[in-house]
Amino acid sequence: VGKNAVIMLGGVDQAIAAGRAVGHGPVAVQVKSVAEAVSAVGSGAGIIMVDTADLADLAAVHAELNRLGLRDGVRLAFGGGVRLQDLGPAGAAGADAVDVGRAILDAPLLDLRMRVCAADFD
């Protein structure tokens, strides 16, 4: 459940309830704070996406979920401008997965061309 849907549905708990009602597997939810992450786990989220672009936020969520004994029951994802050099630090901060959308969307285009040398349509 994306952060805009969380707002439209009235908060993290309501968004997770809506996601669980669909019944298509673990609910993933974007959070922006430790409090939202803890609430999300309590509401049954299976994947917590710390989408703040700040590894300190990810580390704080990871530490708090560990402290509360909740970390083993949930996967942590991290996003927000992730670059290749961020993968190691994200893993060290507790990420099980990373969102590399920007790296893909902002990748330089390849200049490709195709030349047909012969064609046989018989």
PLM feature segments, named:
Residues 8, 29-30, 50-51, 79-80, ...:
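Glycine- and other small-residue-rich loops at beta-strand/loop junctions that grip anionic moieties
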Residues 20-28, 64-79:
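Short beta-strand/loop segments at the ligand-binding rim of alpha/beta enzyme cores
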Residues 35-46, 53-63, 67, 76-100:
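Catalytic cores of alpha/beta
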Residues 51-52, 69-76, 118-122:
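Short, structured secondary-structure boundary patches
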Residues 89-122:
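Flexible C-terminal active-site loop/helix
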